[in-house]
Structures are given as C-alpha cells and as structure tokens.
C-alpha cells in the first residue's frame, strides 16, 4: 500500500508537466519538434482556438500574429488535414526553411487613410536593444473596416540574438519617429 501511495504521489507531482507544450519559442526545429508541430496541426482541425498562443491584441484593438517555425509547420499540417492529405517531406522542408532563424510578425494596424501605413518603420525591443527588421512590407492600400482603414503589414526579424523565453516589444513608428503602435510579444508562451 505504501508503494502505491508513493507512486501516486510521484504521478501527481509530474502530471502537470507531461504533455504540456514547450515553454519557449524555438527558431530552429529538431526532428522531435517537427513531429510535434505536425501532430498539433492535425489535431487542431477540430479546435477553433488554433493559433491563440501566437496572437496578441493591443489596447487600440490592432492585432499581431507571430509566425514561429513551429506555428508555420503546424499551420501547413492543419491546412493539409483540412484537405484530407498528409504533408509531404518537401512541404515540411519548405515550411521549415522559410521560417528557420527568423521571427516573422503579421500586424494589422488601423488608420485614417488608405495609405497611412506606407512609410511605417517597425523595431523590436529586447530590453534596451533595438532589433531592426530584415524585411518590411507595409500595405499601401489598406482595406476599409468598421469606418477605419486596416493595413496588414509583414515584418521579419533575425532571430539569432533572441532567446526563446523573453518578452519583446514591437514598436511601429511613423516617418517622424513617433510611436503609432506597440505590442508585447511573449515568446515564453509560444512554441
């Protein structure tokens, strides 16, 4: 009986950690992480909350989606599962290669005119360190939604200096260097 109680106690101690997602974003996937991402994508077909850990909203109601390598591969597996297909090795390689070593961020910003975001400049703050993007694509012809224009912007940052566990701040500035939007990105809550 005592042995049973000890085993039960050990099981209770370790139970919350078994099967839980990794507690940090990874910018380069190993084979185990690739399989986990594919499995998560396949399972997500029946879940409406897929992608929640990679999305954020700021006080102004603007949205941000972080595309980590795990998220990209899980999304590819999800899309294949919707079609009743499995991912081919070539598809896996493509999904991993396009996001490996990068932090890709999709941001939807709101403004008064169709071209308001054209010259916006993003920067990622890691403490006091500013990380400049390697690629910026600001939408020049924003769509009108709910009386304001919504511009979908794509920003790619190098992940070489980023750990996977920190909190970062994405700051978007206008050409006059005035902050127009900020987002908190919690990498420790993402895979």
Question: Model-predicted segments: where are they?
Answer:
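Positively charged n-region of N-terminal signal peptides that target proteins for export
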Residues: 1-4
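Bacterial N-terminal signal peptides
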Residues: 7-17
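Conserved functional micro-motifs across diverse proteins
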Residues: 22-191
């Amino acid at each position: 009986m005592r042995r049973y109680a000890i085993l039960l106690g050990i099981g209770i101690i370790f139970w919350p950690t078994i099967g839980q997602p990794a507690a940090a974003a990874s910018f380069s996937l190993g084979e185990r992480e690739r399989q986990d991402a594919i499995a998560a994508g396949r399972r997500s077909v029946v879940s409406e909350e897929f992608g929640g850990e990679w999305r954020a909203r700021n006080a102004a109601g603007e949205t941000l989606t972080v595309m980590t390598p795990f998220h990209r591969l899980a999304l590819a597996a999800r899309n294949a599962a919707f079609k009743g297909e499995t991912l081919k090795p070539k598809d896996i390689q493509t999904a991993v290669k396009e996001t490996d070593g990068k932090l890709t961020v999709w941001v939807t910003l709101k403004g008064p005119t169709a071209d308001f975001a054209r010259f916006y400049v993003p920067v990622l703050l890691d403490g006091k360190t500013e990380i400049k993007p390697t690629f910026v694509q600001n939408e020049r012809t924003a769509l009108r939604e709910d009386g304001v224009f919504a511009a979908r912007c794509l920003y790619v940052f190098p992940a070489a200096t980023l750990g996977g566990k920190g909190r970062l701040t994405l700051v978007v500035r206008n050409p006059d260097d005035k902050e127009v939007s900020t987002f908190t990105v919690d990498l420790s809550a993402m895979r």
